[in-house]
A protein has these predicted regions:
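Cytosolic-side membrane-entry/anchor segment at the start of a transmembrane helix
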Residues: 1-42, 153
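Membrane-water interface of transmembrane alpha-helices
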Residues: 2, 74-91
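Core segments of transmembrane alpha-helices
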Residues: 37-41, 68-69, 113-119
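Alpha-helical transmembrane segments and their membrane-interface junctions
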Residues: 45, 112-134
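Short, hydrophobic transmembrane alpha-helix segments
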Residues: 47-58
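Hydrophobic alpha-helical transmembrane segments and immediately flanking/interface helices
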Residues: 125-152
C-alpha cells in the first residue's frame, strides 16, 4: 500500500478538500475569464465613444496586426508547453498544491495574452484607426478567449 493511500485512510477528508480546491481554482479561472470578457466589452464601448482623430497611425496599421498575431502565437505556444502538461500532471495528482498553482498561473497568462489582442484594438480605436479593424481584434480576442478557456481537471 502506498503512503498516499495510507494517508487517505488516516485523513478521509483530505482527498475531498483537495478536490474542492481544484474545483475552486477552476471556478476562479472561469470568473476571471468572464471578467476579462466584460472588460473587453467595456473597452469596445469606451473606444467607440472616445474614437481618436483619423490619420494618426498613417500607413502603420500593419504593426498592431503583427503584434496581435505574435500574442496569439505566444498564447498557443504557452498553452501547449505549459498549461496542458501541468493539466495532465494535475489530473494524475490532484492533491499537489504546487501543480494547482502552476496550472492556474499558466492559464491566467494565456487568458491575459488573448485579452491583450482586444486591448490592441482599444489602442487602435484611441489612435483613430478604422472601427472595423478594432472590432475585428475584439472579435478575435473573444474567440480565442473562448477557444483557450480553462479546462476542468
Amino acid at each position: 500500500m502506498s503512503r498516499f493511500s495510507q494517508k487517505d485512510r488516516s485523513q478521509p477528508g483530505a482527498a475531498a478538500a483537495q478536490v474542492q480546491a481544484v474545483e475552486a481554482a477552476y471556478v476562479a479561472l472561469m470568473r476571471a475569464q468572464r471578467w476579462l470578457v466584460g472588460m473587453l466589452v467595456a473597452c469596445a464601448i469606451i473606444g467607440l465613444k472616445l474614437h481618436g482623430p483619423p490619420g494618426v497611425l498613417g500607413n502603420r496599421i500593419y504593426l498592431p496586426a503583427i503584434l496581435a498575431t505574435s500574442l496569439l502565437t505566444l498564447a498557443f505556444t504557452l498553452r501547449g508547453r505549459l498549461v496542458l502538461p501541468s493539466l495532465d500532471e494535475l489530473r494524475a495528482n490532484p492533491r499537489d498544491a504546487m501543480l494547482l498553482r502552476r496550472w492556474s498561473r499558466n492559464t491566467l497568462i494565456v487568458q491575459w495574452l488573448c485579452t491583450a489582442v482586444g486591448l490592441t484594438g482599444f489602442a487602435l480605436q484611441l489612435l483613430g484607426a478604422a472601427t472595423s479593424l478594432a472590432l475585428t481584434l475584439y472579435a478575435i480576442a473573444f474567440a480565442y478567449l473562448f477557444m483557450l478557456r480553462p479546462v476542468r481537471p
